[in-house]
Amino acid sequence: MNEVEQLVIKNLLLDEEYVRKAMPFIKSEYFADTTGKKLFDILSKYFTEYSAIPTKEALVIEVGQIKDISDDQHHEIVKAIGNIDTEKSEFEWILDTTEKWCKERALYLALMSSIKIAEGNDEQRAAGAIPLSLIHI
């Protein structure tokens, strides 16, 4: 995970107000690697189910329940959880940073999708779908 992704995950684990304001705009696919995606999925599912932020211990237990990851990925996710520090970020700054990151990732993913469509590598969408993918950013 890059630094911004680490900050997003950290604040989702530490700051309930941040979770309530930011989580609706964050998507799993915005994270560049499996570690970030899986951690976000666990945090999101936990918060939706319990309306509370999980402890690090709960996260580790939830990671153990994931079936579609390798042992190496499991180890990386558990290691990332252990590396999360407990210092909250300044609230307005982390919200602004998260908003900017979400916009950048949405644009990047839309552009990558458009390239795939343009090259004929998307079996589900034709070239006419390119403008639609960029409109929905």
Language-model regions, residue ranges each:
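A short N-terminal interaction module
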Residues: L43, R105-G128
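Conserved small/polar residues in nucleotide/adenosyl-binding loops
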Residues: I135-I137
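Noncatalytic partner-interaction/assembly domains of nucleic-acid and motor enzyme complexes
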Residues: M1-W101
